[in-house]
């Protein structure tokens, strides 16, 4: 999750294409600064002068890369969605799920989603999620990745639960995914829960819940 800045599409509204190395470094510096700042603050609280200082750029250079702060946020969100999609594509495949089997496959999904929502993108995810009702729907790219991930889950574990029929297995796996995403998304904005992502307890709870729901025996350690 900590690779280089991805090449951003030139069709992001208000984001000016960076062609020269200096322009790319300026853009990347501002994006990295924003990713870090959003871990603890809201976008509306970020000052461009502060982002410039952290990134080692000038305020004027901000406007050579981004039309305004809304465009800047679109760039942050695009970078996060591309990075997260790439992570799912490499770490979560139908072949890997078949190798892991029912319990290992469910655990892998919980761990991967937990890792992504606890990564450097956490602040961008939170800000984007809080803007889900905006007219431009900034959450749409993440929703697309979720649909692709669910399809992979179905393909990889479609015959891993023989005690259920094919249709019920698909429905139950869909609910497993809904449960994981719903609980961990809620953790983005609400800390007042008995289990949290910060201490990892919510991941343990989710794994136990999914195994029980899918009729997979708990491990000896989980039964203790």
Where are the regions that the model predicts?
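N-terminal intrinsically disordered/low-complexity leader segments
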Residues: 1-25, 218-224
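Short secondary-structure transition hinges
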Residues: 103-105, 121-152
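Hydrophobic/aromatic-rich alpha-helical bundle segments in the mid-to-C-terminal region
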Residues: 139-143, 158-208, 220-224
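Hydrophobic alpha-helical connector segments
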Residues: 71, 75, 89-120, 176
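Short glycine/proline-centered loop/turn elements that form peptide/ligand docking sites
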Residues: 12, 17, 36, 42-48, ...
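Generic hydrophobic, amphipathic alpha-helix propensity
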Residues: 25-34, 51, 76-88
């Amino acid at each position: 999750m900590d690779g280089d800045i991805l090449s951003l599409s030139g069709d992001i509204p208000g984001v000016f294409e960076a062609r020269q190395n200096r322009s790319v470094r300026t853009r990347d510096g501002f994006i990295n600064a924003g990713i870090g700042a959003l871990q603890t603050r809201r976008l509306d609280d970020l000052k461009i002068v502060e982002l410039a200082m952290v990134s080692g750029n000038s305020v004027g250079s901000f406007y050579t890369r981004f039309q305004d702060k809304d465009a800047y946020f679109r760039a942050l969100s695009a970078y996060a969605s591309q990075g997260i999609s790439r992570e799912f594509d490499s770490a979560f495949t139908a072949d890997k799920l078949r190798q892991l089997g029912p319990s290992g496959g469910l655990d892998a999904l919980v761990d991967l989603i937990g890792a992504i929502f606890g990564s450097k993108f956490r602040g961008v995810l939170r800000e984007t999620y809080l803007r889900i009702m905006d007219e431009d729907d900034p959450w749409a790219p993440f929703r697309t990745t979720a649909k692709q991930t669910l399809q992979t889950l179905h393909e990889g574990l479609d015959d891993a639960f023989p005690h259920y029929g094919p249709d019920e297995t698909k429905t139950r796996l869909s609910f497993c995914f809904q449960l994981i995403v719903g609980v961990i998304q809620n953790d983005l904005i609400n800390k007042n829960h008995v289990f949290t992502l910060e201490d990892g307890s919510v991941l343990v709870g989710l794994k136990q819940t999914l195994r029980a729901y899918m009729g997979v025996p708990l491990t000896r350690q989980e039964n203790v």
